[in-house]
Amino acid sequence: MKLIMNWVLAATLLCGAGVFTACSSDDDNSDKTNNISEKIIGKWMVDELDGQKCPTNYKAVITFLSATKAYGSLSDINSDSWNNHASADVVIDGNKVTLTAYENEHIKHVTVTEINTITDKDMTLKSDWKAYLDGKEMINEVYDNERYIRISDDYENDIIGTWEGKVTSSEDEHTDGELHRWEYKANGTYVYYSKENDEWKASNDVMADYFVDGILLCTRWKKTIDSNELREWWEIESIKDGVMKWKALRMREDGTTYTATFEMTKVQ
């Protein structure tokens, strides 16, 4: 599976792989892609890349606010990029959707996409993503046979508060089966607590950030200024009656996958 390299792929992913080709004149295909500027409005999350289920730590969310504006969120697994509701300009022409975003004054990302089908539940697509440094192309990636699913839940506000819980699956790379506690704040930071002598002690990490976009929860933290930055990715399955459930599709080193689960209770 090709690796996602930047948030703009959140925009870019919106259309799968493959170099853009002209729209089909087939009437049936046309029926599946008409009124894209209306159907595309809303929040979408990548579900499959190149025909394979997408691990959670590769997932991106993109929200189309209108036919001309969007924003995307991605905690990039391959770089230091951290994009929380990053904005992008959109141009829609038939089933061709182009997204343009500026990472800074020097780096521009352009994604040309072709939507094959779009419904109220999902869309299948292709994409051709290019990144430019001072006008010079430095990266070009194409994706084929991608699928995005529409996201109706948004837990950005519901997660705020203090939660205690542990992993509920037999396997997960991030947790040890012990109880853990997190306090998620409205400003996009959090406090992690560990238990010492039956008392919860707040950590003093120099960085502890998180974002929720739809159901995607991403965190990053550093213990000290000189330590490596660590990241974690989950999908919020539900928040109801003071109970929050997470799940994540993880990939082992041998390429096989498993589903990790986590459950916690709100304590304040």
Predicted regions and their residues:
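Bacterial N-terminal signal peptides that target proteins for export
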Residues: 1-9
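Ser/Thr- and Asn-enriched, surface-exposed coil loops between beta-strands
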Residues: 68, 93-95, 117-123, 213-215, ...
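Hydrophobic helical h-region of N-terminal Sec-dependent signal peptides
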Residues: 9-17
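Edge beta-strand at a domain terminus
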Residues: 128-161, 204-210, 247-268
